[in-house]
Design a protein with these regions (language model features):
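Inward-facing hydrophobic residues that define packing positions of alpha-helical scaffold repeats
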Residues: 48, 55, 89, 119, ...
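Single-residue signature of alpha-solenoid repeat helices
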Residues: 51, 85, 115, 151-152
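TPR/TPR-like (Sel1-like) alpha-helical repeat modules
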Residues: 93-97, 119-127, 144-167
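Structural motif corresponding to the intra-repeat A-B loop/turn of tetratricopeptide repeats
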Residues: 41-45, 79, 109-113, 145-146
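Residue position in alpha-helical solenoids
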Residues: 54, 61, 88, 95, ...
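Charged, low-complexity interaction regions that mediate assembly/partner binding
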Residues: 169-205
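Amphipathic alpha-helical repeat scaffolds of TPR domains
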Residues: 1-15, 20-42, 50, 61-74, ...
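Intrinsically disordered, low-complexity segments enriched in Gly and acidic/Ser/Thr residues
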Residues: 89, 97-104, 110, 114-120, ...
């Protein structure tokens, strides 16, 4: 691709308000985004390898770009280079606190305590409850055999969010409900304190 293909278009007036500007991503950036979505939908080594040349050029041009680094981490994960992917996520989380970064790093983490701490941070750094439900379900899974009261708290929050969004209860969630039957969940204050302690016990870097 030429330099022109990598050049973002001149900002144009935004429909959101007078005086504001939006920048149209370059052709190459748009292709990279499409390739990443395809990889997420079909996470195969072949698809990762196809995207690699474009991604490597993007990294050469924008070595600190958050999206490019994230895409590279996902490709490394698919290709089995887990340590390289983890290094990138840790680098990203030194300067960014996006909830999905914590969750994606959690998926690469084997230690149950560290994994739980990362999902705690994903929950804390996501303002919209509807996007927390998946993180809460993952945390409940991790806690169900270790701390049933906290697992019950997260599961109830997850179920409430799913109902608000019009989602049904899956077979897995039904099984978890049965497993936690009769368990009294902790309070909001107790769980917030738990998040804090987990983050202190398992620092990211």
């Amino acid at each position: 691709m030429s330099d022109e293909d990598w050049r973002s278009l001149t900002p144009v007036p935004s429909p959101k308000g007078e005086g504001s500007k939006v920048t149209i991503p370059s052709v190459a950036q748009q292709l990279l985004t499409c390739a990443f979505h395809e990889i997420q939908e079909d996470a195969t080594v072949d698809n990762a390898l196809k995207a690699m040349p474009l991604l490597q050029e993007a990294m050469r041009r924008y070595p600190r770009n958050k999206n490019c680094l994230r895409y590279m981490a996902v490709v490394y994960r698919i290709m089995g280079e887990k340590d390289k992917a983890i290094d990138i996520y840790q680098q990203l989380l030194k300067h960014n606190c996006d909830s999905y970064l914590y969750a994606e790093l959690a998926e690469l983490t084997d230690d149950p305590g560290k994994k739980a701490a990362l999902f705690c941070q994903a929950i804390q750094n996501q303002r919209q409850e509807k996007f927390r439900s998946g993180y809460r379900l993952e945390l409940s899974r991790l806690l169900i055999d270790r701390d049933k009261s906290r697992a019950a708290y997260e599961l109830l929050k997850c179920i409430a969010s799913r109902k608000t969004q019009g989602f049904g209860i899956t077979k897995e969630i039904q099984q978890m409900i049965q497993q936690l039957s009769g368990v009294q969940p902790v309070t909001d204050a107790d769980q917030q304190e738990f998040y804090k302690k987990m983050v202190e016990k398992y620092p990211i870097c």
